Amino acid sequence: MSATSSPAAPSPGAASATGPVLELRDVTVTFGGVTALSGVGLAVRPHQVLGVIGPNGAGKTTLFNVACGFVTPDTGTIVREARELGRLHAHQLAGLGMARTLQGLGLFDRMSVLDNVVVGADRHASVGFLGSLLALPRAAREERELRERARAVLEELGIAAYADRYPPSLPYPVRKRVALARALAAEPTLLLLDEPASGLSADEMDELGDLVRSLTDRMSVMLVEHHMDLVMRVCDEITVLDFGRVIAHGTPAEVRDDPAVLAAYLGEVVGDEDAPGALPATTEGGR
């Protein structure tokens, strides 16, 4: 369905089993007088994959940074399970049950793959720096548990064989999986993915799509992506941005047939699946 303004936000209140796990309400962001987002609203629901798409310059990256709490909007609010968020530091995301991956990956080149993933799992540790420094038995036990958790995630993503390797020695698609493993090791209830398919082959994107769908039994996913075939296949709902505004929101089938979306991507070319850049066919519900 088309939207010339942001979707109406649900009434404030305690999050329910079916209420949003993350909401952006009437968010506006400007940089030096340039409006990056204007009155944007969206909601990520439990066990849902929400896709965010739009042409280049539509405001997707800004929206992602707002959702992460790294950009504070000029107006509007970000609500995480009924808790209004302000500006966050990276280490605070895990405490809110959130994890993210970035286009730049952000891996530690001088740490092994396993140790990179342990960094993500570290939010579960209860022994502080002093306890670790003194090598208390409890600290040693927690270290073993964190490494076991990290190895389990590497196994889940099919990259356990790389545990002792270092990121610079790995192919780019494997490094992408390491970054995802680090995020999953935090055991989030909301996973934020920024362009996870960039640099992947068609077969690797298919594997990524299957993985993202498999995650929804234990978390929600917000996916910012420009590969339309992946978005249409894995997302339950899609929010479309253009020039910093929400122009459409709905199921993949609804978005694919929306005239405003077709115009934003293709100009006046509508309804021709063979046209360059045409939106791919999809099944209902992103399944």
Regions inferred by a protein language model and the residue ranges of each:
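Glycine-rich phosphate-binding loops of nucleotide-dependent enzymes
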Residues: S2-S5, G13-R287
